[in-house]
UniProtKB/Swiss-Prot annotation:
Coiled-coil segments on the chain, per record: none
Protein's organism: Brucella abortus (strain 2308)
InterPro entries documented for this protein: Xyl_isomerase-like_sf, Xyl_isomerase-like_TIM-brl
UniProt EC number: 5.1.3.38
Catalytic activity: D-erythrulose 1-phosphate = L-erythrulose 1-phosphate
Official protein name in the record: D-erythrulose 1-phosphate 3-epimerase
Gene3D superfamilies: Divalent-metal-dependent TIM barrel enzymes (3.20.20.150)
Keyword Isomerase: yes
Pathway in which the depicted protein is active: Carbohydrate metabolism; erythritol degradation
Record keywords, A-Z: Isomerase, Oxidoreductase
Keyword Metal-binding: no
Biological function: Catalyzes the racemization of D-erythrulose 1-phosphate to L-erythrulose 1-phosphate.
Length: 310
């Protein structure tokens, strides 16, 4: 199997809401088959009847267009403490929330759900004993979600390494250390990472920790999905792969594919994670610039466009 290209729906949140509008735009205008669906489109906290209706609507749109939801991820309004929250009842809420999310994604044909491993407060992260206690609690929370997700037909759950210690996975060494611990937890289905090659602690003494290519060489065997965007030296945003950004960006197809291959990539999903400001003219450039980004990668990574029905 070959690498496949997908899109995280972050930049489509609020700009689209109805399943038909979202999915038809992806097929017709972006010419891309695979989506990582963020939770805002079918929010697990909504009423069950609303979730069921919108999930049915989205599934019909997927069947009609050939678009696929491959996974579910928390979106721009879901970067929260979750299983790192100090309050037990709040953590309980999010365990149930992610179980519902797993059901939604499973019903849409996706194979995984995830978010950050946990986000700790200053207070909890800075206390070594409390930090370790809360890490164990977070792993237990994920194990419960994984057990439910297995029943929903998912293949794995995932965590996203970030760029600071209290969000976890901030260096390659810390990232692999936590991954080893999660693998050893032997959950009902595996918990893999979903690495973003543009993340990493820019204050690290090891330059590999903020080198996208070093991450690309390291993570493929433990990161079925890998986020990419056009990386600038200032780490200034989730830039699209447009001609203007490509001219000054670090990420180019040939060296990136070489790095992935060196890391053992075989059938990984390479997921575009982009964002656009709610300002003019950016707000109306979203679809054209994502389409340009997809077209930029199309000669190198399978977009699945041949499977689209519109």
């Amino acid at each position: 199997m070959a690498l496949t290209l997908s899109l995280n729906t972050n930049p489509l949140v609020n700009r689209f809401a109805e399943p038909d509008d979202l999915i038809e735009t992806v097929a017709r205008d972006l010419r891309l088959r695979d989506l990582q669906l963020t939770h805002e489109f079918i929010n697990p906290s909504w009423q069950a009847s609303t979730i069921r209706r919108l999930t049915r609507d989205m599934d019909r749109a997927l069947q009609r267009t050939g678009v696929r939801v491959t996974s579910g991820m928390t979106g721009p309004y879901g970067r929260l403490n979750h299983f790192g929250h100090p309050d037990r009842d709040v953590r309980r809420y999010y365990v149930d929330w992610f179980k519902t999310f797993a059901d939604i994604i499973g019903d849409l044909g996706g194979k995984s759900v995830g978010t950050q491993f946990a986000i700790f407060t200053y207070k909890d992260f800075d206390d070594p004993a409390r930090r370790e206690e809360l890490i164990k609690i977070a792993i237990d929370c994920w194990a419960e979600v994984a057990e439910h997700a297995a029943g929903a037909g998912l293949d794995y759950v995932f965590w996203e390494p970030m760029s600071i210690g209290r969000e976890f996975g901030e260096t390659i060494a810390e990232c692999m250390k936590l991954q080893d611990r999660l693998t050893a937890a032997n959950m009902a289905i595996p918990m893999w990472m979903m690495a973003d090659i543009d993340h990493g602690d820019v204050t690290s003494a090891n330059p590999d920790d903020y080198d996208p290519y070093a991450w690309a060489r390291t993570v493929p065997k433990v990161s079925p999905i890998i986020h990419i965007k056009q990386s600038l030296m200032d780490k200034g945003g989730h830039r699209p792969f447009t001609a203007a950004f490509n001219a000054k960006g670090r990420i180019q197809p040939e060296p990136l594919l070489k790095a992935f291959a060196e890391g053992g990539a075989v059938d990984n999903e390479i997921c575009l994670e982009l964002s656009f400001k709610e300002r003019e003219p950016n707000d109306r450039e979203v679809i054209p610039q994502i389409a340009e980004s997809v077209a930029f990668w199309a000669p190198h990574i399978d977009t699945g466009a041949k499977d689209l029905k519109i």
